[in-house]
UniProtKB/Swiss-Prot annotation:
Protein name (database record): Gamma-glutamyl phosphate reductase
Catalytic reaction equation(s): L-glutamate 5-semialdehyde + phosphate + NADP(+) = L-glutamyl 5-phosphate + NADPH + H(+)
Domain of life assignment: Bacteria
HAMAP family on file: ProA (MF_00412)
Organism (species): Gluconobacter oxydans (strain 621H)
GO function terms (MF aspect): glutamate-5-semialdehyde dehydrogenase activity; NADP binding
Function text: Catalyzes the NADPH-dependent reduction of L-glutamate 5-phosphate into L-glutamate 5-semialdehyde and phosphate. The product spontaneously undergoes cyclization to form 1-pyrroline-5-carboxylate.
Length: 427
């Protein structure tokens, strides 16, 4: 459901948002009552619609790409780009979500009391979710799928650069909802890139139950600063891969190349390499050679530059930078504790990995890292809801309340208590 937006004033934006939220609340009530088969049917039909509309979606995406300013880097363009293959991946993602167990109505716990009352805690939808994301248009499809499956209505706000793409994807989601007999207002998008509409979303206490921002640091900070609605924040993916002295060199080369260069513009990409001083003289030149051959550049500390003098010197801010590009920060460290200290100073609590053959070193790293996801001998690019078996994800939560790591179906539910009696009274 798309409403026209003709002004940037907060009053008009608030009026438009109120209408969207009212429709979403009504839709959320009907969606919560729909059985799992109906919700799954909507997702299957939406997947079909994505395939039918694939040419239309790619053409809309080309409009977004054509309007993109020339100063946007290659990684940003890659995040924005949709191809027939990526549309097909979106469709398969919807089908994967449809095939997951129903998260609604699960009995999370149950117990009896001495007075004969039976208690149970049952998973329920959250209600209306506001999703604010940036350039990747496929995020809208993933978010819509997870919300439909978990019985939540969603209001989507994508980046202004992807508005044509978002509208084309939205049409496919509406096709699926309509085919299943569900309210099309289960999935809505903000009608324009007007920032006043984002402000209205953030102020919609009592109308939107949860805001999930997915994007860069400035977006997340604005949402956290201005929101009067609960926020499930997705922070920077300032991820580290630490190569321990016991690492198998061939494994380390393979993992780091994937962790950095498979897709440089996603939040699961490694942004900093930490390499143990004991292995750095032999291994670091090989790692640099592998990555440079794929177009990667480097920002290195003095110890790394002493081993590979051609590396550019790191500035004071480089180890605090989420590059989202073919750039890697490099530091030499003295063991696990030094690596953990570096991560504590510079990390974003997203994803860290250790490459090691020594299980004691790996255990020390896993237990000592206060991040949402910690890996051993695996690429940080596995930090993805699909790879976790969640079907898709709506973001990576790095806070400590309600959810951490990839946010999938389970994290989009809350619960109610049901109390079953046989006529008990308290008096």
């Amino acid at each position: 459901m798309v409403t026209s937006c003709c002004s940037g004033s907060m009053s008009e934006a608030g009026h438009i948002l109120d209408g969207l939220a009212e429709h979403a609340r009504r839709a959320s009530r009907s969606l919560a009552r729909a059985n799992a088969g109906t919700r799954n049917h909507a997702l299957s039909e939406a997947a079909k619609a994505l395939r039918v509309r694939s040419d239309e979606i790619v053409a809309a995406n080309q409009k977004d790409l054509a309007a993109l300013s020339e100063d946007r880097n290659a990684a940003f363009r890659d995040r924005l780009t949709l191809t027939p293959e990526r549309v097909e991946a979106m469709a398969r993602g919807l089908e994967d979500v449809a095939g997951l167990p129903d998260p609604v109505g699960r009995v999370l716990a149950e117990w009896d009391r001495p007075n004969g009352l039976h208690f149970r805690r049952v998973a329920t939808p959250l209600g209306v979710i506001g999703m604010i994301y940036e350039s990747r248009p496929n995020v809208g499809a993933d978010a819509a799928a997870l919300c439909i499956k978990s019985g939540n209505a969603v209001i989507l706000r994508g980046g202004g650069e992807s508005l044509h793409s978002a509208r084309a994807i939205q049409a496919a989601m509406e096709d699926g909802l309509r085919a299943a007999g569900l309210d099309e207002a289960c999935v809505q998008i903000l009608p324009s890139a007007d920032r006043a509409l984002v402000g209205a979303m953030l102020q919609a206490s009592g109308k939107i139950d949860l805001i999930i921002p997915r994007g860069g640091k400035s977006l997340v900070e604005r949402v956290q600063r201005e929101a009067r609605v609960p926020v499930l924040a997705h922070a920077d993916g300032l991820n580290h891969t630490y190569i321990h002295a016991s690492a198998d060199p061939a494994m380390a080369r393979k993992i780091l190349l994937d962790a950095k260069m498979r897709r440089t513009g996603i939040c699961g990409a490694t942004e900093t390499l930490l390499i143990d001083a004991a292995i750095a003289p032999a291994l670091l030149p090989l790692l640099v050679e592998d990555l440079a051959a794929k177009g990667c550049t480097f920002r290195a500390d003095d110890r790394a530059r002493a081993i590979v003098p051609t590396l550019a010197a790191a500035s004071a801010d480089d180890f605090d930078t989420e590059w989202l590009d073919a750039v890697l920060s490099v530091a030499v460290v003295d063991g696990v504790e030094d690596a953990l200290d570096h991560i504590a100073r510079h990390g974003s609590s997203h994803t860290e990995a250790i490459i090691a053959e020594d299980p004691e070193a790996a255990a020390e790293f896993l237990n000592g890292t206060d991040s949402a996801v910690v890996m051993w001998n695996a690429s940080t690019q596995f930090c993805d809801g699909g790879e976790f078996g969640f079907g898709a994800e709506i973001g990576i939560a790095t806070g400590r309340m309600h959810a951490r790591g990839p946010v999938g179906l389970e994290q989009l539910t809350c619960y109610r208590y049901e109390v079953i009696g046989t006529g008990q009274v308290r008096g």
